[in-house]
A protein has these predicted regions:
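A beta-strand edge to alpha-helix "cap/lid" segment located at domain peripheries
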Residues: 2-17, 22-32, 42-152
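Helix-loop segments that flank and shape redox-cofactor active sites
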Residues: 39
């Protein structure tokens, strides 16, 4: 895996992409965020919407940042990377967002989630070939199963 200008480890390539993602998000520059994706990338957002390709990603996120995400701040929290082959790695990025709003305009509480990225080299460096984003959800509280009734 390589960065745009140098040969580097998958871990470092993912760190650079995560830093660039955070910077682009916080600048609300979705064109720059889109440049981190392969032109034919698959991107599934936290709501399950499947965006196909860089241009669909950019179009959707430009609109989102004009409305709900206009005042949002993204923070990278943790990153793990596993090299799958010389040109492919799997990354998980834990994040937090503050300052975004619901579609009706109500301010949301800060929230966390996990991004899953498939990273690939494209001849110019590492890019996000596929991404799936999800919000952390509270774990369900386990309830004990009642003991089965005994036959008499």
């Amino acid at each position: 895996m390589t960065d745009a200008h140098e040969s580097t480890s998958p871990q470092r390539a993912a760190e650079v992409l995560a830093q660039r993602w955070q910077h682009a998000w916080n600048a609300h520059d979705m064109q720059s965020a889109g440049e981190l994706l392969a032109p034919d990338a698959d991107f599934v957002n936290v709501g399950g919407r499947w965006l196909r390709g860089r241009s669909e990603f950019v179009d959707y996120h430009v609109r989102l940042h004009e409305m709900q995400m206009r005042n949002s701040t993204w923070s990278d929290l943790a990153l793990t990377v596993r090299e799958l082959s010389a040109d492919v790695a799997l990354a998980h990025l834990e994040w937090q967002i503050e300052g975004d709003r619901d579609p009706d305009g109500r301010r949301r509480e800060p929230r966390r989630g996990v991004f899953t990225w498939v990273l690939a080299t494209d001849g110019h460096g590492a890019v996000i070939a596929a991404a799936h984003n999800t919000n952390h959800m509270p774990a369900p509280t386990p309830t004990p199963n009642p003991a089965p009734a005994r036959a008499s």
